[in-house]
């Protein structure tokens, strides 16, 4: 997965 500065708790990837 990619590092997400917004949502790193519920999901390892950005939920756009």
Swiss-Prot record:
Which InterPro entries does the annotation name?
A: Formaecin (IPR012514)
Q: Keywords for this entry?
A: Antibiotic, Antimicrobial, Glycoprotein, Immunity, Innate immunity, Secreted
Q: Where in the cell is it found?
A: Secreted
Q: Which Gene Ontology CC terms are recorded?
A: extracellular region
Q: What induces it?
A: By bacterial infection.
| Sugar attachment sites | 11
Write out the GO biological process terms: defense response to bacterium; hemolymph coagulation
Coiled-coil features, chain-numbered ranges: none
Q: How is it modified after translation?
A: O-linked glycan consists of a Gal-GalNAc disaccharide, O-glycosylation is essential for full biological activity.
Which domain of life, per UniProt?
A: Eukaryota
Q: What does this protein do?
A: Antibacterial peptide. Has activity against E.coli but none against other Gram-negative bacteria and Gram-positive bacteria.
Query: What protein is this chain from?
Result: Formaecin-2
Species of provenance: Myrmecia gulosa (Red bulldog ant)
């Amino acid at each position: 997965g990619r590092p997400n500065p917004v949502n790193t708790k519920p999901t390892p990837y950005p939920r756009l």
